[in-house]
């Protein structure tokens, strides 16, 4: 239904190749920023976020930002994992600032595995290829590009606009800049709200844009260690009381346990709005669960979709396994890592208690692993955020709904919410049914998505900054 509203013209536009001859001068410069970021290696193993931050800071300074408006940060133990905070002052003494957040680091990419060099921005058949083209250097480039343009155009926002480019989002092994800023430089990034990755649109197999999503909250990651112990003995005289068997039974209990269905304003709005755009049985179930979360038939239907199943509850899954100490000995110890994605509002303690009750074996020890996550609350479904997102979308994506979403994954937003900065994943960019290859091989994004999303976000930030 939504696709028919768009019409053939938009469908054709989605697959248009943006050659250099077709680009406006401002788009050409944006492409240069995008290229510089993608071609600056920011992997943990061999790259440098500090270098990327310095390059972006140099562009801002060349545009007219004063040294006092640029703050570089890093810590001695992680010199290559630094970041940048930039500030464009607003004219209002009462309007609180807004924060643009972006992580510079990317997931590892091996040249031998890729069709093209992952650290060269390559445009081919209407798509940009390279590590970070989607996650999330396209947004980083957009933030830098718009601040450069605002400065050069002498645009004076009502709100102060802050930008934080950080490192460490893609791995727990790195220095996380967003976490460090929230704990050590809270005043520097103080804002009424933040805009981040996590939203975006989806096109169908014909290239017709179906929806744009705005992320309003996300799950919280919490790891648990499950362990069993036993005196062990010689494997020639086995007994049923075996640490590995005991652990296996506990893991099956975790597999078979479903946390209770939980909904909030965001997920209720998602299922109602996204379901209304479908004509199949799944769409009917989506609308039904939004109206009545106790509808067991609707829940059963939704549970057949792994993404919807996860959106409706806390989930826990075994991800790592170890056990035994010798091939000819009964195991003295066996263990597993349990990766939980807690629904906003849930606590580590409640999640642990639910798992222990499901396992039902006091001989299985469950321990929460650091970092211990506190209770995460979703960002409010605020009309001051949703309204401008929908209004600007009507200009760039006519007939396409903007749907509130809750991510089942996690981003650096998890560090901002606890310090009072609600964070929203922006709409704008989109991918097709095959996805963008983020974290995988041959990561890519369509040129049409890149340039249209960039224009959309520039107008959206102006709408927020002028309010």
Residue ranges and their predicted role:
Residues 21-131, 140, 150-159, 338:
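Acidic/His- and Gly-rich active-site-bordering loop/insert found
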Residues 4-15:
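Bacterial N-terminal signal peptides
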Residues 43-45, 77-79, 91-93, 104-108, ...:
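Solvent-exposed loop/turn segments at secondary-structure junctions
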Residues 49, 96-97, 109-113, 173-178, ...:
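Short, solvent-exposed loop/turn and secondary-structure capping segments
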Residues 21, 59, 199-455, 462-467:
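Metal-dependent amide/peptide-bond hydrolase catalytic core
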Residues 16-20:
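Sec/Tat signal peptide C-region and signal peptidase I cleavage site
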Residues 127-128, 134-213:
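Acidic/histidine-rich catalytic neighborhood of metal-dependent amide-processing enzymes
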Residues 23-31, 42-53, 79, 133-136, ...:
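Solvent-exposed, acidic/flexible segments
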